Amino acid sequence: MRKKTIVDGLEISYIEEGEGSPVLLLHGWGCNGGHWKAVIEGLKADHRVVAPDIPGFGESEEPPETWTTADFADFFEHFLAAIEMQDPVIIGHSNGGRISMMLASRSLARKVILTDSAGIKPHHSASYYAKVYSYKAMKKALSLPLLRDKKEAILDKYRGKTGSADYNAASPGMRRIMSTVLGEDFIPVLKQIKVPTLLVWGSEDTATPLSDGETMESVLKENGVDTALIVFEGRSHFAYLEECPRFISICKAFI
């Protein structure tokens, strides 16, 4: 069932199904709570499952300023209080994994499942940094009085050629947020997590590669966290959807 509530002045839309022990599902960039539909169906018989549209996605309002992942975590801490959900198991995909880790580091989760999660700062090629620096130089040059009127049109054309699909599809405000969160390093956050954490990864994930999951597993184990990495061979960044029945079975066993 779709519901709406106001949290920190923002209207947020979310799906809620079932009764029992609480489960919070946090989707990835460019997705919404509806992407968890099959997972919700698989868990709702024994659990109260909530899948929000993260602010800026789906039917939820966009953040009023450039939020960091910590700001999103603040928001969801208040959201959990608003819907009276305590100590949920949090399942996070991609960018939703960042928020899940932040909430877990604050002792707001009983357990965590991260599937193809973001959070390990990427190592880019020289050509990537060349694009970044050329973009910044172009942006500065276009601020000159003679070019100011054409600035946004030129930048939009450049972004269309060089930006990712998610970046190009986002609003200006969400683009700024994306640029901010992509630069965050979650190793320090991982070191603060104490609850059992399961990692589920597609072996062919090119957005957040399997090596990211291996790094997370290593950091968690070094800090004495009960953790394991399960690899879905031949699957991509959306491994949880590509093998949904298997993913649901794993979640049920872990929860």
Positions of predicted regions on the chain:
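Conserved HGGG/HGGXW glycine-rich cap/lid loop of the alpha/beta-hydrolase fold
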Residues: L10-E59
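Active-site loop/oxyanion-hole signature of alpha/beta-hydrolase fold enzymes
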Residues: V7, S13-I15, A51-I91, S249
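Conserved alpha/beta-hydrolase catalytic His-Asp/Glu region
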Residues: L114, S125, K140-V195
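Short alpha-helix in the alpha/beta-hydrolase fold that links the catalytic acid
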Residues: V195, P209-V219
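Catalytic histidine-centered segment of alpha/beta-hydrolase-like enzymes
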Residues: R235-C244, I248
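Alpha/beta-hydrolase fold catalytic core
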Residues: M1-V23, K44-H47, M85-Q86, R110, ...
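Short beta-strand/loop motif that positions the catalytic acidic residue
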Residues: I193, L199-W201, D205
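Flexible "cap/lid" loop of the alpha/beta hydrolase fold
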Residues: R98-S105, A109-S143
